[in-house]
Swiss-Prot record:
Gene source species: Histophilus somni (strain 129Pt) (Haemophilus somnus)
Gene giving rise to this polypeptide: aroA
Binding positions for phosphoenolpyruvate per the UniProt entry: 22, 96, 127, 175, 347, 391, 416
Family: Belongs to the EPSP synthase family.
Reaction catalyzed: 3-phosphoshikimate + phosphoenolpyruvate = 5-O-(1-carboxyvinyl)-3-phosphoshikimate + phosphate
One annotated Gene Ontology cellular component of this protein: cytoplasm
Keywords, comma-separated and alphabetical: Amino-acid biosynthesis, Aromatic amino acid biosynthesis, Cytoplasm, Transferase
Lineage: Bacteria, Pseudomonadati, Pseudomonadota, Gammaproteobacteria, Pasteurellales
Protein name from the UniProt record: 3-phosphoshikimate 1-carboxyvinyltransferase
Gene3D superfamilies hit by this protein: Enolpyruvate transferase domain (3.65.10.10)
Chief location category: cytoplasm
Gene Ontology biological-process annotations: amino acid biosynthetic process; aromatic amino acid family biosynthetic process; chorismate biosynthetic process
């Protein structure tokens, strides 16, 4: 297995131009494909998850032109439901941002009835999709499980979704609601969605609603508990769509600065539609100096103190706080993060396990993690298992800000969202 050893870094300094956001990139491609008109999507992320979406769209008959550097895609919209030859199978890797929205969109009524199979890597077959399938079936969708009940692979027939009242569980993942919301306007009737339980990761729903609006569709909602969507509508291309920089990816550079230097990230700012921009506010609460601009966030180090906080609204960026906690004064508790357990891997167990290898004192609860700080000279060298999870690899790069080196196993797993992460991290790492 490939491994990468990072030597201790004495300070962090520089500017990072962020790659496009994964969740915005795949939403933009799908909306552009379903829309009337041609859309030029710019600052598209070039990564594995985006390639799975692009390959699926091509197989579904969508024409697009991708620039040589893969960051600009001109998509010719089909102006409605997908059409395909019966018996199509789409392999989506471990891309939740492709699997969930496509599962809903492929239920829309086609001109001729066809079946499609959605499948992926072994880990994808362990990632729950039951809440979405249950909701789609309430609207009349025809979906079957091919292996284990509640998990991909799925067989879907394009017999239509017919609106009406739908209940969906919001407690595990906001991607299920996102998928339903994006498909609903093209359905055969008006839909009223009621959320069961507490909706997790609300800011990701804000992203979905903002993007649907950019493509001409308005959704009414009542305090994130009920959503009303008119059926028989069309998405209209905005002609161009700029994908914001990835706020989750910004978290590693901003945290590095809070621990040991100063960094400016460009591509997101105070008006970003991504909830993970709020990560910078968490760093500020821990004591870091944060400056906001229209299209940048700058963080400068200061003495950090531990925090006790509900981070349900920023689950991806919260992982970075788990590492930052080692460098703070006093314990840190990250709460209400059960959905870490259904991501690329069970992130709660994975992070607790790898932190302990470094010598950290960690308590792992069902939906929280409690972390005690470590003195810079008390970190143990460790080989960090990454569980084929891009965010674990990027998080643990920050351990090099201690007095000891760290070895990251399978560093190439960052290709899911940020193939050039380690070279960008190296650019801001100073050793004099």
């Amino acid at each position: 297995m490939e491994k990468l050893t990072l030597s201790p870094i004495s300070r962090i300094d520089g500017e990072i131009n962020l790659p496009g956001s994964k969740s915005l990139s795949n939403r933009a491609l799908l909306l552009a494909a379903l829309a009337k008109g041609t859309t030029q999507v710019t600052n598209l992320l070039d990564s594995d998850d985006i390639r799975y979406m692009l390959n699926a769209l091509k197989a579904l008959g969508v024409n697009y032109q991708l620039s040589d550097d893969k960051t600009v895609c001109v998509v010719e919209g089909i102006g409605g439901a997908f059409q395909w030859q019966n018996g199509l199978s789409l392999f989506l890797g471990n891309a939740g941002t492709a699997m969930r929205p496509l599962a809903a969109a492929l239920c829309l009524k086609g001109d001729t009835e066809s079946e499609v199979i959605l499948t992926g890597e072994p880990r994808m077959k362990e990632r729950p999709i039951k809440h979405l399938v249950d909701a789609l079936r309430q609207t009349g969708a025809n979906i079957q499980y091919l292996e284990n009940e509640g998990y991909p692979p799925l067989a879907i027939r394009n017999q239509g979704i017919f609106g009406g009242k739908v209940q969906i569980d919001g407690s595990i993942s906001s991607q299920f609601l996102t998928a339903l919301l994006m498909a609903a306007p093209l359905g055969e009737g008006d839909m009223e969605i009621e959320i069961l339980g507490e909706l997790v990761s609300k800011p990701y729903i804000d992203i979905t609603l903002a993007m649907m609006k950019d493509f001409g569709i308005n959704v009414e909602h009542y305090n994130y508990q009920r959503f009303l969507i008119k059926g028989k509508q069309y998405y209209i291309s905005p002609q161009t769509y700029l994908v914001e920089g990835d706020a989750s990816s910004a978290s590693y550079f901003l945290a590095a600065a809070a621990i040991k230097g100063k960094v400016k990230v460009t591509g997101i700012g105070r008006n970003s539609i991504q909830g993970d921009r709020l990560f910078a506010d968490v760093l500020a609460q821990m004591g870091a100096k944060v400056t906001w601009g229209e299209d940048f966030i700058q963080v400068e180090k200061s003495e950090l103190k531990g925090i006790d906080m509900d981070m349900n609204h920023i689950p991806d960026a919260a992982m970075t706080i788990a590492i930052t906690a080692l460098f703070a004064q006093g314990e840190t508790v990250i709460r209400n993060i059960y959905n870490w357990r259904v991501k690329e891997t069970d992130r709660l167990t994975a992070i607790a396990t790898e932190l302990r290898k470094l010598g950290a004192e960690v308590e792992e609860g069902e939906d929280f993690i409690r972390i005690q700080p470590l003195a810079l000279d008390k970190f143990k060298h460790a080989e960090i298992a990454t569980y084929n999870d891009h965010r674990i690899a990027m998080c643990f790069s920050l351990i090099a800000l201690s007095d000891t080196s760290v070895t990251i196993l399978d560093p190439a797993c960052t290709a899911k969202t940020f193939p050039t992460y380690f070279s960008e991290f190296e650019k801001i790492s100073k050793n004099q």
